[in-house]
From Swiss-Prot:
Leader peptide range in chain numbering: none
Entries under PANTHER family matching the protein: THYMIDYLATE KINASE, UMP-CMP KINASE 2, MITOCHONDRIAL
Protein name, UniProt field: Thymidylate kinase
SUPFAM superfamilies: P-loop containing nucleoside triphosphate hydrolases (SSF52540)
Amino acid sequence: MMKANFIVVEGLEGAGKSTAIKTVLDTLKQAGIENIVNTREPGGTPLAEKMRALVKEEHEGEELKDMTELLLLYAARVQLVENVIKPALANGQWVVGDRHDLSSQAYQGGGRQIDASLMKNLRDTTLGDFKPAFTLYMDIDPRIGLERARGRGELDRIEKMDISFFERTRERYLEIANADPSIVVINAEQSIEEVSRDIQDALNEWLSRQ
């Protein structure tokens, strides 16, 4: 019997993460894995959701500094990992996450251009060697992704960043993904059917090796 694993879906705004997560859940269930916990970052616990709101919302009269944003994200992540993800895995439940640490490495390390050694030290200090077993990165041109995101309604504080921010974020995502065999890059600019097929193929191939 396969041990419970932590699977994450990553991507820029408008990359289709919600649809990808549904495909992941369906594929796992088809493989006989029914006991699954869903998480999202930032958030996923009552306290972490409050931190999510602080990161996402505009703060009239006060700028949220990049370092404050980064520390809030890691504080929320620790709450989620320690209070939800690790207990679920220990209980034999699979966990499917909407974002995890790779988001911070890409958005704050790449987009915000925060020092790489600081990013690594913060990750190592807060998470240790904890990481997802398998990650699907939904890759999309930021212009296409933001167009899709705008179609959903009002943009949040981070979604309002300029295009160069998202280009740097995407570049960092791809840089990390290309160096880590546990991360699979999915072309999210394809049709929903093609994207779903690629996700199913990648996930089933990974499951066959567990």
